[in-house]
Design a protein with these regions (language model features):
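Conserved, mostly hydrophobic/aromatic
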Residues: 5, 25, 64, 81, ...
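Active-site beta->alpha loop and helix N-cap motifs at the rims of alpha/beta catalytic domains
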Residues: 47-116
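Catalytic cores of alpha/beta
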Residues: 14-19, 89-100, 143-156, 202-208, ...
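N-terminal capping/small domains of soluble enzymes
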Residues: 1-78
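Glycine/Thr-rich beta-alpha phosphate-binding loop at enzyme active sites
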Residues: 50-51, 108-118, 149-210, 250
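Alpha/beta catalytic cores of nucleotide-metabolism and tRNA/nucleoside-modifying enzymes
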Residues: 188-212, 219-282
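Short beta-strand/loop segments at the ligand-binding rim of alpha/beta enzyme cores
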Residues: 1-4, 75-81, 130-141, 205-215
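Glycine-rich beta-to-alpha transition loops that act as phosphate-gripper elements at the mouths
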Residues: 8-9, 82-86, 139-145, 164, ...
């Protein structure tokens, strides 16, 4: 099992020690052209997590490839690059330009990208033709039938899934009766997302049996094992990294007495899972 960061929740160049405490680092989503993102304020705390409306702020493909990626490689960390865009060719062209990395995560929840099963499959198929690198499709549980989207991207050539992206939410300032975020709504993340993530991972693993990076409200070793029990092969940390940068090391310590690889194998085999649970109870 790999422990990763959720895209956009950690800057490896400014916090290399935290990045090195993970098994692999996932970059912010890269788009063909630079994006400044949304007007501040674009982050707001909630009772059980946070909202963000960053707007895919990033340096753009060319600067990332020629400036950021070489510096990330110097850190000696296995790299996953998150790729975004607004049409299939945006994704495919960036994928074609990437090499010497561990995997590509396709952010299929970008603004203005229709995440219907056929659109997601079209993007994955275009990227599959453009690269031989492993492709992980990142999906949002906001879709009416996330398992159907998972099946579609699997058929189109995805090697794995990243589940889940944020859900749309709203925070209000009662003094002004205006949204806290300048954009209005934002992506909800944090502990409140975990039950949704568990359900999505369970449904998509049952539908595809693809390797899954589970994420959404992970803050403890128990959270990690719950996602694995639902079918995740790897786990990513997101919002917790803002409040507890030492979370990767702490979670590893919490899992020290568990044979995680045995648990992963058991979670993918119902009979073994029952045996493993019996051992835990004993």
């Amino acid at each position: 099992m790999l422990l990763l960061n959720a895209s956009g929740c950690l800057d490896a160049l400014t916090a290399p020690d935290i990045a090195r405490s993970l098994d692999a680092f996932v970059t912010k989503t890269i788009t063909p052209l630079p994006r400044e993102g949304n007007t501040p304020p674009r982050i707001a705390e909630t009772a059980h997590g946070m909202l963000n409306a960053i707007g895919l702020a990033n340096p753009g493909r060319e600067r990332f490839l020629h400036d950021h990626l070489p510096r990330l490689r110097e850190l000696g960390i296995p790299l996953w690059v998150s790729v975004g865009g607004f049409c299939a060719s945006d994704y495919a062209d960036t994928c074609a330009a990437l090499e010497d990395i561990e995997a590509i995560e396709l952010n299929l929840s970008c603004p203005n990208v229709d995440e219907a099963a056929d659109s997601a499959a079209e993007i994955v198929a275009a990227c599959r033709r453009a690269t031989s690198l492993p492709l992980y499709a990142k999906l949002s549980a906001a879709h009416a039938d996330i398992a159907a989207v998972a099946r579609a991207v699997a058929a189109a050539g995805a090697d794995g899934l990243s589940l889940i992206n944020t859900l749309r939410g709203l925070a209000l300032d009662l003094r002004t009766l205006q949204p806290v975020l300048a954009r209005g709504t934002g992506g909800l993340s944090g502990p409140s997302l975990k039950p949704v993530a568990l359900a999505a991972v369970h449904a998509c693993y049952a539908a595809t049996q693809l390797p899954i990076v589970g994420m959404g409200g992970v803050a403890t070793g128990q959270d990690t094992l719950e996602l694995v029990a639902c079918g995740a092969r790897h786990v990513a940390l997101g919002t917790v990294l803002f409040s507890d940068p030492g979370a990767p090391s702490r979670i590893r310590a919490e899992l020290a007495e568990v044979d995680v690889e045995e648990f992963v194998a058991a979670a993918h085999d119902s009979e073994k899972l029952l045996e493993f649970r019996a051992k835990v109870v004993a």
